[in-house]
């Protein structure tokens, strides 16, 4: 927590009115109390045995929230904050229903004195401590939330209590601090099957065994959601209950109409609670360090006292413990204090499947059982159902008028879920033109696995196939773009509707150019990638074949191929409907099958923290692009051409004849036929292999011609791939190069780039560095390159817990020199460069499971000597071998390995009977957690960068442009370089927090210059 938020005064100032842009945190204090109490072992104050376990947990949770709010899933620092408590169990609801909470037990005796202490703790944090007699904390939270929402401010309710989910809206979210998960409209829908505005009706039907809300016996959340889907709301259901076909359900509902309405009154939160403090009094004031330290010292919280003292730069030893009043017996006040041991309820209240228990007594600490369909059951049932469910293309609808489009959009809003896809004129999202879009909506039946899907296509600018001289040529009966886009925009930007797409980044970037920013979304490609990285492709066609048993219509079947290929705007609308609507249909089915698997596999956090939030970040980066200097590229192209020509002449002299150097056959005949070099092998076609590895091995053996061939290949590749090709990638309008990033192409989580590929420009060769000089900033700007230093070795030190490496990184020691000193007994001071180079090769080689043969080639030494190096390395750092063996064992046992953030990298062939295949998988399983963890770290950094820049007012003046392995490139206005650089470095170095604290520090080197090479 920065020192600037600390003060020695706790006076609350007069502040301006709450407004749009402010962010109010409402902490469910009672929920915090019970979570803290049940999560920690009993703790007493040493001096007198006073129970303080819940107080300790509460203070640490509140400290963490205040200190790290921006680094949580919420991603912002609050401008206003209040902690809300229950005054007592006697509320207006007891007047409505005397049995309300009658089954609640009195809290444990050791918790009773801690209620008052926790209120004192809240005041010590200089935070408003709010409670109102006759009302529950939830009612106070509801009142403040709705008031703040009316001002345009955003609200975060710090609680996971389902009773508060009825408040969730586009401006009101919840936050589960234990799971570091923000809860929005899609999350409510996913968990309960209804949007937040229907939660009151759902709870009224299901009742609540914890609060003794009667509900309708036998109706659980799944059934309630289905009934609400069918009838719309509780009143309509009760009015039309006689229409229900299931006899027992109909009779039960008819017999409990009054109880259902009473239950609705009990679960509906009040938003008109009389409040002593208005919104403006909830502004987050600076913390009073000495006051808080005084309270913490009284509680004997040594560790937290030290942390607070460090944060506020206070001398804790000079601060006296505070005098804190302790509430005992009749003076104590808190939830359920006036409750007795529960009496059996006549007839009982049926357990509600899926019920959550926000504030349980210790005897009821366990959550209620899950519903009949666990995520694993649901995933299995849906997979079985959709594997045989046919596709009916004749049922697809072509939407040609606004009335029909409005009806479909209304249905999507009512359902809260829609799959969509765009049809365009190009695969390049930066140049494609929107032609039409498709929608798919699920109509849920009583069986959650038997989902009927409707799909439609909305053509916008299809042409007749032949344009006229006056510029017309549009096919008849299409909705004008100007009328359709506002409706599409309203739907895609509606956070209450979950949008599902396949490879959404393309659609996101395309639609951004049309002024539409897709919000609240899922991407089936990314879900598949999280679940099954390393086991197959994640495109729509292979996923459809794998999970739905269906091969989608090939694009060439509707648009032709080769010379007959046409852009999609020239495709007949009926044929386009079959193709486009099927895409949306397939996507929605895939989502229904794949999404439950995330929860079943425990991979939801990987998807929600590392994949989904990165998608819009990458789309914005791609849209920005980067400037290249064509003159520099032209000059370099000429230099490379001259270099290639010189190498060709030298090659011809060494070969004794002219030949086609680019022909593998002719080259093989020269090397292994004419010259008779040893070490050659033939491919399956009978030709000599002239792969890069073969040539490098020959060059390492001292043969000059193969070395020249390697050099020639590098030079000609740089010329053809970069200096000649890059100018062709310059966008005609932006005049910048826009690469495209793939989130789901590698097995380890690393991003890849294409069109053009900017991640393979050599950085260690002079020619590669020259190419980087062509990537420049625009006038008045600089490029900042921020690069992680030796991140994979740091990850290795963390996961393998290698003391020598950990200490070296902590002390800022040259890690390669340290390794050389450890292995070869050479002092770091005055160490020859060759010795350090060998240690560096070993350090990085070990990460990739290098063999003695590979290391020998890399260092140009005998294989026996390389083997000795590797043996000695493992002797000096024994934990590394242990780590490697543990990863191989995990891969063999589970079929996958994991990164430090839980990403799974699958190795289905790890048990192959083929020794070569098995060995390859084992080597990959060693490196993958390290490389994947490094990739996860930079993903987290990229996600956190933009909010951090917003917080310091640099959002519009610092633009993240590129990601190249462990490096991020930014374009920054000249006057903001000094302010931006420390923010970027800080976010990157702390990217793992608060989810994970590394055992070794991450280090980022950042520089600014007018071109990429000088900045790197």
Swiss-Prot record:
Its EC number is 2.7.7.7. PROSITE patterns: DNA_POLYMERASE_A (PS00447). It holds the Pfam family 5_3_exonuc_N. Residues 394-630 form the 3'-5' exonuclease domain. SMART domains: 35EXOc, 53EXOc, EXOIII, HhH2, POLAc. Residues 768-1016 are annotated as: Polymerase. GO terms for biological process: DNA-templated DNA replication; double-strand break repair. It catalyses: DNA(n) + a 2'-deoxyribonucleoside 5'-triphosphate = DNA(n+1) + diphosphate. The keyword Transferase applies. GO terms for molecular function: 3'-5' exonuclease activity; 5'-3' exonuclease activity; DNA binding; DNA-directed DNA polymerase activity. Residues 1-308 form the 5'-3' exonuclease domain. The keyword DNA damage applies. This is DNA polymerase I. It comes from Rhizobium leguminosarum.
């Amino acid at each position: 927590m920065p020192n600037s938020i600390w003060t020695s005064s706790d006076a609350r100032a007069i502040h301006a009115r709450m407004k749009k842009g402010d962010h109010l945190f409402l902490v469910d204090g009672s929920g915090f109390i019970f979570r803290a109490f049940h999560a920690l072992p009993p703790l007493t104050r040493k001096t007198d045995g006073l129970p303080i376990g819940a107080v300790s947990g509460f203070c640490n949770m509140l400290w963490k929230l205040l200190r790290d709010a921006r680094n949580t899933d919420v991603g912002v620092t609050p401008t206003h904050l209040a902690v809300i408590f229950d005054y007592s169990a006697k509320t207006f609801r007891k007047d409505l229903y005397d049995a309300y909470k009658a089954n609640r037990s009195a809290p444990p005796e050791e918790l009773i004195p801690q209620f008052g202490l926790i209120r004192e703790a809240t005041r010590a944090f200089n935070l408003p401590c709010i409670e109102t007699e006759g009302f529950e904390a939830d009612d106070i939270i509801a009142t403040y939330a709705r008031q703040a929402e009316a001002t345009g401010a955003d609200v975060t309710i710090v609680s996971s209590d389902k009773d508060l989910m009825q408040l969730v809206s586009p401006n009101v979210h919840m936050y589960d601090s234990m799971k570091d998960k923000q809860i929005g409209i899609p999350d409510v829908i996913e968990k309960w099957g209804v949007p937040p505005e229907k939660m009151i009706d759902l709870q009224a039907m299901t009742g609540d065994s914890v609060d003794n809300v009667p509900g309708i016996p036998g109706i659980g959340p799944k059934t309630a959601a289905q009934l609400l889907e069918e009838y719309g709301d509780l009143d309509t259901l009760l009015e039309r209950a006689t229409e229900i076909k299931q006899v027992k359900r109909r009779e039960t509902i008819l017999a409990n109409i009054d109880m259902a309405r009473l239950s609705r009154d009990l679960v509906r939160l009040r938003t008109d609670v009389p409040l002593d403090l208005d919104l403006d009094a909830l502004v987050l004031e600076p913390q009073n360090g000495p006051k808080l330290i005084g309270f913490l010292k009284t509680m004997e919280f040594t560790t937290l006292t030290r942390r607070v003292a460090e944060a506020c730069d206070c001398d804790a030893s000079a601060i006296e413990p505070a005098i804190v009043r302790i509430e005992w017996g009749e003076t104590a006040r808190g939830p359920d204090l006036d409750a007795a041991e529960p009496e059996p309820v006549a007839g009982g209240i049926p357990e509600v499947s899926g019920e959550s228990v926000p504030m349980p007594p210790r005897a009821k600490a366990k959550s209620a059982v899950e519903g009949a369909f666990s995520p694993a059951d649901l995933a299995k049932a849906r997979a079985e159902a959709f594997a045989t469910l046919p596709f009916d293309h004749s049922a697809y609808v072509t939407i040609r008028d606004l009335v029909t489009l409005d009806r479909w959009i209304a249905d999507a809003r009512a359902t809260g879920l829609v799959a969509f896809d765009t049809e365009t004129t190009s695969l390049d999202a930066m140049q494609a033109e929107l032609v039409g879009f498709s929608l798919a909506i699920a109509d849920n039946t009583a069986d959650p696995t038997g989902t009927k899907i409707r799909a439609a296509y909305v053509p916008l600018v299809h042409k007749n196939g032949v344009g006229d001289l006056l510029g017309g040529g549009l096919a008849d009966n299409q909705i004008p773009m100007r009328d359709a886009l506002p409706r599409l925009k309203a739907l895609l930007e509606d956070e209450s509707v979950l949008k599902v797409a396949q490879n959404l980044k393309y659609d996101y970037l395309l639609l951004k150019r049309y002024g539409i920013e897709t919000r609240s979304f899922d991407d089936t490609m990314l879900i598949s990638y999280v679940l099954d990285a390393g086991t197959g492709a994640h495109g729509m066609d292979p996923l459809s074949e794998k999970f739905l048993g269906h091969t989608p219509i090939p694009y060439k079947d509707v648009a032709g191929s080769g010379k007959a290929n046409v852009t999609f705007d020239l495709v007949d609308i009926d044929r386009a409907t079959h193709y486009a609507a099927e895409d949306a249909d397939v996507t929605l089915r895939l989502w229904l099958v794949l999404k439950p698997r995330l929860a079943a596999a425990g991979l939801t956090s990987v998807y929600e923290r590392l994949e989904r939030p990165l998608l819009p970040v990458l789309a914005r980066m791609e849209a920005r692009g980067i400037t290249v200097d064509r003159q520099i590229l032209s000059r370099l192209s000429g230099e490379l051409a001259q270099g290639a020509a010189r190498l060709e002449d030298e090659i011809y002299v060494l070969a004794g004849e002219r030949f086609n150097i680019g022909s593998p056959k002719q080259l093989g005949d020269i090397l292994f036929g004419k010259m008779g070099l040893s070490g050659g092998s033939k491919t399956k076609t009978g030709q000599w292999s002239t792969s890069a590895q073969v040539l490098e091995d020959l060059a390492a053996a001292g043969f000059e011609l193969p070395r020249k061939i390697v050099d020639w290949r590098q030079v000609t590749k740089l010329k053809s791939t970069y200096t000649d090709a890059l100018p062709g990638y310059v966008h005609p309008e932006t005049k910048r190069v826009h690469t495209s990033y793939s989130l789901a192409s590698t097995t380890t989580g690393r991003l890849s780039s294409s069109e053009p590929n900017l991640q393979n420009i050599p950085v260690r060769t002079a020619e590669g560095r020259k190419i980087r000089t062509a990537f420049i900033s625009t006038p008045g700007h600089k490029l900042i390159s921020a690069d992680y230093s030796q991140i994979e070795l740091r990850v290795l030190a963390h996961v393998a817990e290698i003391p020598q490496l950990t200490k070296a990184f902590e002390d800022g020691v040259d890690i390669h020199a340290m390794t050389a000193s450890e292995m070869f007994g050479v002092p770091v001071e005055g160490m020859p460069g060759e010795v350090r180079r060998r240690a560096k090769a070993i350090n990085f080689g070990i990460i990739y499971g290098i063999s003695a043969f590979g290391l020998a080639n890399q260092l140009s030494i005998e294989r026996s000597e390389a083997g000795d190096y590797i043996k000695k390395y493992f002797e000096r750092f024994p934990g590394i071998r242990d780590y490697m063996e543990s990863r191989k064992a995990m891969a063999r046992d589970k079929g996958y390995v994991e990164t430090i953030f839980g990403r799974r990298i699958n190795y289905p062939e790890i048990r192959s009977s083929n020794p070569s295949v098995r060995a390859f998988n084992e080597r990959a399983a060693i490196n993958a957690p390290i490389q994947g963890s490094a990739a996860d770290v930079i993903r987290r950094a990229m996600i956190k960068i933009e909010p951090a820049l917003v917080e310091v007012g640099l959002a519009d003046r610092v633009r993240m442009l590129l990601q190249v392995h462990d490096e991020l490139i930014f374009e920054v206005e000249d006057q903001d370089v000094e302010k931006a650089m420390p923010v970027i470095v800080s976010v990157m170095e702390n990217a793992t927090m608060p989810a994970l604290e590394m055992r070794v520090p991450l280090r980022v080197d950042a520089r600014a210059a007018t071109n990429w090479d000088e900045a790197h």
